[in-house]
Structure formats: structure tokens, C-alpha cells
From Swiss-Prot:
GO molecular function: ATP binding; pantoate-beta-alanine ligase activity
Organism: Maridesulfovibrio salexigens (strain ATCC 14822 / DSM 2638 / NCIMB 8403 / VKM B-1763) (Desulfovibrio salexigens)
SUPFAM superfamilies: Nucleotidylyl transferase (SSF52374)
Classification lineage: Bacteria, Pseudomonadati, Thermodesulfobacteriota, Desulfovibrionia, Desulfovibrionales
Location relative to the cell: Cytoplasm
Name of this chain's protein: Pantothenate synthetase
Length: 282
């Protein structure tokens, strides 16, 4: 495995690889790998001749008073895990390599970025869309794989690629969970033992909502109200940031559950902001 930190060096290499007919896969990450990240690498590895994993804690997607400085990192551990997974290139740029001091160009997908996480994190998806565009330009991938835990992010990137005619096949990969049902996240390390014991109720609540829909309830307001009550009982130390039922592609908030709907939640539990979702098909 080769480690490259200079964007121009990686771009030159990838342009050469494409000219040679090599199929390039990219898995963008912020590091501190867990089995969720590794499953994305596996999915991309099966499809590509060259697998690139980027490791960059992108400062432009963090707002004030968020956890940029505290975000967990362990480059040595991540490098070992990536190499064992068959990664060919680990891309590890620093901030000054990715953003000039007078950086002034941003990529935004406002129609999909105002609900869910975008409501409480107004600059988040601008930073995500911009850095992913830069990674696509640098790594020149044919395929890029993202986790479905960040469903809104995935929808935004798919729309961005469609609207800007970026020649990348953007794929979503199913959520990987702990045995308890808690969605894997690098931020799970922030949880205390007590918090970790109640966090699996996030997924259980989503499953409850699916059961309510299956039983015939379609009113989104009623479903959300019932889920708020469930979380108040089962995660009393948590604070609900949002519970929404949205269209899975355009992220518009739904008043009634139709043939397909995404229930998405975000809960602040101690120092960890945990997100999860469940696609409900009637």
C-alpha cells in the first residue's frame, strides 16, 4: 500500500492509471476506521483495479462548538487496517493541501440540505459537497462508495454528481451495526458505558415505527410523536435533535407515509451526536 499526502501527486497518478484503462474506486473517510468503513472498502475492492481510501478530517463541514478538534484519530492503526483490507493507496492530505488560504469556491445542494442534519448544522453539507468534489477531481474515481448511515449525505452527493455531470458511480452501502443494533460510528467512542447501554434503543425505535406503519398508521405527525415518547422512556438522558419522515431521494418532509419513506433520527447522547435511519417500504 502506498500513502500519498499531496493532492497533485495523487491526481497525476490517477490520470495515468485511467489512461492505462484501470478502474479506480474511492472510499472517502475521516478516519478512525471501524467495521463500517472496512465494509465500504470491501465493496469497492470487488469492483476496481485500484482502491483509494482518503483519510481527511474535513474542517469545512464542522460548525462552531462541534467536535473538530476532538475527532478521534489514529493514523498508524488506520494504515494497518487499510493495508490488510487490500487498499492500494491511502490518501492523507493536510488542510493546507486541500484548501488555499483564500479558498472561496463552494459546492452546495440547497434543496436537499435544509432538513434533517442541515437544520442544526447549516454549513455542514456545503463542506461535505465541496470536499467530495475535490476528492473526485483529485482521485478521478470511476466508483465511490459511501455508507447509508449518512443517508442525507449520500442523497446530496448523488444529486451533485447528477447535476454537475461528474462521471462517478456513487454507491450506498448498508449500515453496519454492533451486535446490540447500535450503528457503527467513529463518534461511539465518546459514549460512556451507561450511554452505550441505552443507545441501541435508537434502532429499536426505528423498528417500532416500521411496525406501526405495517399495522396501518400512515400519519407522519402521529408516528413522530409516538417515537418521541418511546425515546423519552428508553433514552431518558438523550436529547432528540430531530425525528423526520422524508422522501428517500429528495429528502422532502412527508406528511403521510406512502410506498417508500425514510425515517431518520439524530439524538445527542452525552458528548456523542448519533444518527440512524430506516427505509420503510409499504
Amino acid at each position: 500500500m502506498e500513502t500519498i499526502s499531496n493532492p497533485q501527486e495523487l491526481q497525476n497518478l490517477c490520470l495515468m492509471l485511467r489512461a492505462e484503462g484501470k478502474k479506480i474506486g474511492l472510499v472517502p473517510t475521516m478516519g478512525y476506521f471501524h467495521e463500517g468503513h472496512l465494509s465500504l472498502m470491501d465493496a469497492a475492492r470487488k469492483q476496481c483495479d485500484v482502491l483509494i481510501v482518503s483519510l481527511f478530517v474535513n474542517p469545512t463541514q464542522f460548525g462552531e462548538n462541534e467536535d473538530l478538534d476532538a475527532y478521534p484519530h489514529n493514523l498508524e492503526r488506520d494504515s494497518e487496517l487499510a493495508e490488510k483490507r487490500g487498499v492500494d493507496i491511502l490518501f492523507t492530505p493536510i488542510r493546507d493541501d486541500m484548501y488555499f488560504e483564500d479558498h472561496s469556491t463552494w459546492v452546495e445542494v440547497p434543496d436537499l440540505a435544509t432538513n434533517l442534519c442541515g437544520k442544526s448544522r447549516p454549513i455542514h453539507f456545503r463542506g461535505v459537497a465541496t470536499v467530495v468534489t475535490k476528492l473526485f477531481m483529485t482521485a478521478q474515481p470511476h466508483v465511490a462508495v459511501f455508507g447509508q448511515k449518512d443517508w442525507q449525505q449520500l442523497a446530496i452527493i448523488k444529486r451533485m454528481v447528477r447535476d454537475l455531470n461528474i462521471p462517478v458511480d456513487v454507491q450506498g452501502h448498508e449500515i453496519v451495526r454492533e451486535e446490540s443494533g447500535l450503528a457503527l460510528s467513529s463518534r461511539n467512542v465518546y459514549l460512556t458505558e451507561d450511554e452505550k447501554s441505552v443507545a441501541p434503543n435508537i434502532q429499536k425505535g426505528l423498528q417500532k415505527m416500521r411496525d406501526w406503519v405495517t399495522a396501518g398508521e400512515s400519519d407522519a405527525a402521529k408516528l413522530k410523536s409516538d417515537l418521541v415518547e418511546f425515546y423519552a422512556e428508553t433514552i431518558p438522558t438523550g436529547r432528540v435533535d430531530y425525528i423526520e419522515i422524508v422522501h428517500p431521494e429528495n429528502i422532502n418532509i412527508l406528511k403521510n407515509v406512502g410506498d417508500s419513506a425514510l425515517c431518520a433520527v439524530a439524538i445527542q447522547l452525552g458528548n456523542a451526536r448519533l444518527i440512524d435511519n430506516l427505509l420503510i417500504k409499504v
